[in-house]
């Protein structure tokens, strides 16, 4: 597989990645939000002054409250599931108790899926099964070889393709996702109906780099379908992008964030006015400070204070 295809992005991914990053930073708050630089920059404001203003402005995180309130309401009563003939199956019980091979139950994993869908508008769930040399189901049970699920947020699903079946139903016939990424390389996984391939791509984020794309592993797709489900929060008008619960709240939070900055500026400047003086006038800051001026200083050069009125 050539590097150009492995580093390609779907047009809808390019159109929505900025919003997705804005939503997740708005939900996380703290340094993640501050590092997004969502304060409006003043004209002629230096980078140092802008960074200082960011440090002094608190974040009132409404986005996290919205997502957690919805999640708490939906999961207030645990879901009831009917497994039919599979009820009591050892592999099913193992999956329900540890759905992601990381010790989290199926309910816990699906709660996270719902939260991510609320933040981004949609969330991807991929089902996989470890490769093994076992020949019987008894050996699989003994070694706990079974399917598990992985969660992928929309930033990591970089390319896809839908096709319409003869029945009229749309189905995935290609899915490209980024499993891991750093400054030097990325691990990319390509799903098709025929195979599942894993590649290591050097200099993945450099658009015109000549880094190597090396195949790590390629296994047949035994089910002939891409084992991925797109979980929507609300369906959008373009598949597979959903509508986030934060589509409006995030911008409201940004507005409040900027209002807090303006209030902080107003209070600080009102309480600490600016002193205008000539270079030869000695003055110190602080309450009760003394200003020494030369005896022969002209009257029109005497120090004076600039202070905002605070009336808006």
Walk through the language-model features, giving the residues of each.
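Extended, helix-rich architectural segments
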Residues: 1-152, 156
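Intrinsic disorder/low-complexity signature
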Residues: 11, 32, 48, 57-58, ...
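General helical secondary-structure elements
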Residues: 21, 37, 49-51, 60, ...
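Intrinsically disordered, low-complexity segments enriched in small/polar residues
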Residues: 27-28, 34, 82, 86, ...
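Intrinsically disordered, low-complexity, compositionally biased regions/tails
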Residues: 33-34, 40, 88, 92, ...
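A broad, structure-centric signal for solvent-exposed, well-ordered loop/edge residues
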Residues: 46, 66, 81-84, 134, ...
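Extended, regular secondary-structure scaffolds
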Residues: 111-239
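Extended, charged amphipathic alpha-helical segments
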Residues: 210-312
């Amino acid at each position: 597989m050539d590097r150009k295809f492995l580093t390609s992005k779907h047009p809808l991914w390019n159109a929505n990645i900025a919003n997705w990053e804005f939503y997740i930073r708005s939900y996380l708050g703290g340094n993640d939000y501050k590092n997004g630089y969502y304060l409006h920059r003043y004209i002629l404001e230096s980078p140092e002054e802008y960074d200082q203003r960011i440090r002094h402005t608190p974040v009132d995180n409404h986005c996290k409250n919205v997502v957690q309130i919805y999640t708490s309401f939906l999961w207030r009563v645990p879901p009831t599931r009917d497994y039919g003939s599979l009820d009591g199956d050892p592999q099913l019980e193992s999956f329900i108790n540890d759905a992601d091979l990381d010790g989290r139950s199926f309910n816990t994993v699906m709660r996270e899926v719902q939260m991510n869908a609320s933040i981004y508008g949609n969330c991807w769930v991929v089902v996989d099964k470890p490769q093994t040399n076992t020949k019987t189901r008894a050996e699989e049970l003994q070694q706990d070889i079974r399917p598990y699920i992985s969660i992928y947020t929309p930033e990591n699903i970089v390319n896809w393709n839908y096709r319409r079946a003869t029945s009229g139903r749309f189905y995935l016939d290609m899915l490209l996702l980024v499993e891991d990424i750093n400054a030097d390389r990325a691990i990319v996984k390509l799903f098709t109906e025929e195979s599942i391939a894993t590649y290591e791509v050097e200099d993945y984020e450099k658009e015109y780099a000549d880094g190597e794309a090396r195949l790590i592993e390629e296994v047949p797709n035994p089910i002939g379908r891409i084992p991925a489900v797109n979980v929507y929060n609300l369906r959008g008008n373009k598949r597979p992008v959903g509508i986030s619960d934060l589509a409006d709240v995030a911008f409201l939070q940004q507005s409040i964030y900027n209002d807090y900055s303006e209030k902080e500026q107003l209070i600080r400047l009102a309480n600490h006015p600016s002193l205008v003086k000539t270079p030869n006038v000695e003055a110190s800051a602080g309450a009760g400070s003394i200003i020494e001026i030369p005896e022969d200083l002209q009257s029109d050069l005497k120090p004076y204070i600039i202070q905002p009125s605070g009336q808006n």
